[in-house]
Amino acid sequence: MELGQQLGWDAYFYSIFARTMDMQEFTAVALRALRELRFDFFRYGMCSVTPFMRPRTYMYGNYPEDWVQRYQAANYAVIDPTVKHSKVSSSPILASNELFRGCPDLWSEANDSNLRHGLAQPSFNTQGRVGVLSLARKDNPISLQEFEALKVVTKAFAAAVHEKISELESDVRVFNTDVEFSGRECDVLRWTADGKTSEEIGVIMGVCTDTVNYHHRNIQRKIGASNRVQASRYAVAMGYI
């Protein structure tokens, strides 16, 4: 970790991850770095932006597999206070009884899995996608002094982890905004989001209703929506319009 202090934490983490070629190798390198900080576990989790009620959760790291399966099966991402925090803040947050007061079962099960002391660091990519880096240890509570000292480290680590996982994994629904809409499709989306019907959009854009509906079908196919209302809501949530 002395090298991290010399190079700067961003450069240090990017450099050690640059040599990793797959998730297994990446996880091993990440763990070696984190164990120097006395952490036993790490998880980088992301929630898909859609669907809204049951977003898909993606987790990477070495959290106990039974816990990961339980977390996903119980849809804990919806109530997890660290996930909620990550949507409104870029600052790290300490896990505590107080933080998890509203979801005691989640906190109890995490403790039962040896995830007793930890913190969460939000991370944002250039497309606005939100990820959460969670670090945990079995023993030794994190003091406020240690937490303050870790802030610059965890922020750099989370950014480097996000970029490397994005490189190694190809699930564009989570990490990228590879869907491309034409200018006309964007216009149709915006007018639909404003409550206009196909007929009204056709008049505004100077095209026939069938042409507007053709654009709607293409939009729904690209974004994975079942109807035009859902498509416009997804487009807003994902930052396309």
From Swiss-Prot:
Residues 198-217 bind DNA. One of its GO terms (molecular function) is DNA binding. Keywords: Activator, Antibiotic biosynthesis, DNA-binding, Quorum sensing, Transcription, Transcription regulation. One of its GO terms (biological process) is quorum sensing. Gene3D superfamilies: Transcription factor LuxR-like, autoinducer-binding domain (3.30.450.80), Winged helix-like DNA-binding domain superfamily/Winged helix DNA-binding domain (1.10.10.10). Residues 174-239 form the HTH luxR-type domain. It holds the Pfam family Autoind_bind. InterPro entries: Sig_transdc_resp-reg_C-effctor, TF_LuxR_autoind-bd_dom, TF_LuxR_autoind-bd_dom_sf, Tscrpt_reg_LuxR_C, WH-like_DNA-bd_sf. Positive regulator of phenazine antibiotic production. May activate the phenazine biosynthetic genes by binding to a DNA sequence upstream of them, or to an intermediate gene which, in turn, interacts with them. Belongs to the autoinducer-regulated transcriptional regulatory protein family. This is Transcriptional activator protein PhzR. It comes from Pseudomonas chlororaphis. The lineage of its organism: Bacteria, Pseudomonadati, Pseudomonadota, Gammaproteobacteria, Pseudomonadales.
